[in-house]
Amino acid sequence: MAESMVGLKRSHRCTEVSSADIGKKVTVMGWVAKRRNLGALIFVDLRDRSGILQILFDENIIGKEGFDKAYTLRNEFVIAVEGEVIKRSGAVNENLKTGDIEIAAKTLRILSESETPPFPIEENIQTKEDIRLKYRCLDLRRPDIQSNIIMRSKVATLTRAFLANEGFLEIETPMLTKSTPEGA
């Protein structure tokens, strides 16, 4: 069941947390990218638009109720985690910007549950275009699509700023753009 966000405020995006934050309390939010259950420990790769951060759920830290809740997590659940930044006790993941740290979760809130997605939300996964378009909201979470959107936004912002500094006005009129059939 989804929980309220009342009183929650994100302190960092996933890749903004670094080894300089070790020992600090942080609040991160995002989608569950992967979940690994090792019995006494549960590891979750939390993904937001900035990247991935590993979350550690240890029953000794989060308590039985929180650990049981972490056990129910599945891919693409939206969660908020408050915890302490710690140095990874296991192997460092050189492929991640945050590969040398993890968050030892002290509280977990499930903000939204999700059914199993129709395709994996990962890079380099080949999915039929009609499926990707049907589930566009999921496709937009893929890192390669996000990087395209971010680049397009930056170019549009720089173009607007340049033209505004040159004294141009931005005028929106339907006569300058092609109309879309059926309001699509």
Q: What positions do the PLM features span?
A:
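Class II aminoacyl-tRNA synthetase catalytic cores and aaRS-like
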Residues: M1-A184
